[in-house]
């Protein structure tokens, strides 16, 4: 009894100790001896003197346990205790065992040092089995789990004081495969009490995380099990790369490593607990899942229902394009206030105050519209928009300051100015722009004190006079002129509508004083200064002898001049016939060759504007309507506009303007181009409609070319035009240049940028700012300075600044290259110095990709270093016409000669290869489209490409024969 009593007493004491708190995992119990309702009936081996079952009463409930305290002094203690068969089922592959036990301290036995063979540990073992094996112990089949040692052992003193501690041991059994198992406890000599044994497995419980629900999950035998969550109602998976919500169930039944999460849909936000998505209340919105919470509707917007994703603007308020739902709604501004003006001559200043209501925006802008009316505002006469001569400073649109300066107005005319206030939401509603207007009647523009009357013709009883009006009259201006004519005997007044008058019924050989003034609905203007004119003396009835001699001499002189003209025209016709026979000209310009006026420099005129009118047609600005800016020229902006000549239909034109800030000497340079164009008439030369020189801004009006400059047109339509279309365009350019050369003009700036294309793909030569007249067909023009377009200019023109028709032929070859390369820049990124050196060394541009061989041969002929060997434009035109008539000849692709490839001096490869990288090489031969093909094939160095064959290129996906030929020819050039 000595070994039993102390242990039993200890059990009664320790059962009163609290158990440790449960784990977070969900535990499913398979066996728990502490809940047993009767004796456990476990297998004891040996049946006696070993483990024994004990019963204790706790709070009226029996508690069954096992204890073993062997006789001390024996070293061969071998006591076994086996549990009943524990059914595991098919679910859990990993179970846990929890032991509650006490162990007596060996030193607490009588003797102090502990009895012989006393131990303080015992062993836990298990055996798997698909069924109950009965009372057969089968010790060899058990596998050891662990050696169980007590953290706290007790002594007799602990029993007496009631401080015995209960030990708890947990261990796991993994990767179980049978339907059940047995537990066994092997005691090698410890005094131990097995208070309870619990066998269980763990599950990850159902849970919520990140607005996603995760189900109850069984862990795996080892490692983590990934489980996908399900988003709660009105929630969606995050669009971020983390993706849908996921968590990982650990073998211990705990949720670990959350990845991703759900977010509430637009119109919903997380509830206070973060476990549900609730609708945004009315008056608030949530536009996207990136917004953390519902937001209050911005000003002037509302959301009447719950769950709104956007707040709608209230009536009369809007959001400007590009403004998001988070921006407050705003309205258009009210009209400008207190519009006033001050006038000085034909200039006007308008001022106004900002609108009283800006609509809640800061981007208020103003627009000013000008109308010229035949009557006053009270008369209600018809009005039309002001012409191009009216200018607004700083502008008429998008004004940020409430003021504008207007000039270019006409005297004695009625104007109405309308000022509109606009902001970012103007025009979004049904209401129009808020505006205010003012009507103004202009007075006298200026004094006529500087007006000069000029005598046109005089006779004994008539005087024809003309004068320059102070400003051109516009339609509806109702201007008339009143002349005051007097001499010593009479005085008369006469009114005319034009600045020209024929005074009749005058006295012969009499002096008359004449002055003029303008009459308008506002009243008469001031008179001009007095001018004296004298009529011719009366003609006598008979001729004197001297007069008869003069008449005879005049007749003889006229006959001689007529005879000289006839001889000159006969010889000229003979020369023209001989020239046509030599050149076999076919162009339309040969059919009607005109004798053109020789080029006259405007500086030779005392009045250069009058010189320009000798070669051009002066247009009335009232016939023009400016639409939009289409470009910026050397002298000013270029506009698209409309020209309506009297009794003719409207036509679209291009309007080049001379800006007011140009230096004083620039305007005659501007008009010089018009004087040259005015002498040309050819379907492939840009047609001049006329000029405006009598009012600022000075303008040149030409026909409008819908497709703009040739180089930009080709870049936009790369691979859309077939070779036949390109040849037709080149034939047109050659025809125009042939016309110029036959009239002894050298262009000096022939390039694709100076060729214009209309809607029918007809090309016309333009930009004659550098054009000069040669003395004869083979003449030269030498310039003293100025910039030269190196990439398009012949070498002799670069070196000696001497320009001929042959230098234009060289430029035409560059234009051909531009056309066949669809607008590429000649010579790429080479500097001008590198271009000049390469040309002097004999290098020429390589053929463009898929360039027909006959066209490249023409290019090379144009680039002959000796200018005498270059073909004339007539032969170029004829050759291009032959190619158009025989399109099959365009199928042959030009060979790529690597000896003509332009090499940059800065490139220095190895082994005779002038390129550092494969991409540089492919770009130089215009095969850069295949850079990825070479990279994918692993050909990243120039040494790798030297052994390529046609079969290799086919396998790489380069199948076009012309492209294969170009690449292989270049490689062969490296080898040579």
From Swiss-Prot:
Signal peptide (from-to): 1-25
Localization annotation: Cell membrane
Active-site residues from the entry: 749 (proton acceptor)
Stretches assigned to the Eph LBD domain: 27-209
Catalysed reaction, written as an equation: L-tyrosyl-[protein] + ATP = O-phospho-L-tyrosyl-[protein] + ADP + H(+)
Sites bearing Phosphotyrosine, chain numbering: 599, 605, 781, 930
Tree of life domain: Eukaryota
Cellular component, GO annotation: plasma membrane; receptor complex
Positions in the Cytoplasmic compartment: 569-976
UniProt GO MF annotations: ATP binding; fibronectin binding; protein kinase activity; protein kinase binding; transmembrane receptor protein tyrosine kinase activity; transmembrane-ephrin receptor activity
Record-listed ATP binding positions: 630-638, 656
UniProt PTM: Phosphorylated. Autophosphorylation is stimulated by its ligand EFNA1. Ubiquitinated.
Fibronectin type-III domain residues: 332-445, 447-538
UniProt feature coiled coil, ranges: none
Extracellular side: 26-547
SUPFAM superfamilies: Fibronectin type III (SSF49265), Galactose-binding domain-like (SSF49785), Growth factor receptor domain (SSF57184), Protein kinase-like (PK-like) (SSF56112), SAM/Pointed domain (SSF47769)
Glycan-modified residues: 414
Alphabetical UniProt keywords: Angiogenesis, ATP-binding, Cell adhesion, Cell membrane, Glycoprotein, Kinase, Membrane, Nucleotide-binding, Phosphoprotein, Receptor, Repeat, Signal, Transferase, Transmembrane, Transmembrane helix, Tyrosine-protein kinase, Ubl conjugation
CDD domains for the chain: EphR_LBD_A1 (cd10479), FN3 (cd00063), SAM_EPH-A1 (cd09542), TM_EphA1 (cd12841)
SUBUNIT field: Homodimer. Forms a signaling complex with LCK; PTK2B/PYK2 and PI3-kinase upon activation by EFNA1; regulates T-lymphocytes migration. Interacts (via SAM domain) with ILK (via ANK repeats); stimulated by EFNA1 but independent of the kinase activity of EPHA1. Interacts (kinase activity-dependent) with PTK2/FAK1.
Protein's recorded name: Ephrin type-A receptor 1
Annotated organism of origin: Homo sapiens (Human)
Lineage: Eukaryota, Metazoa, Chordata, Craniata, Vertebrata
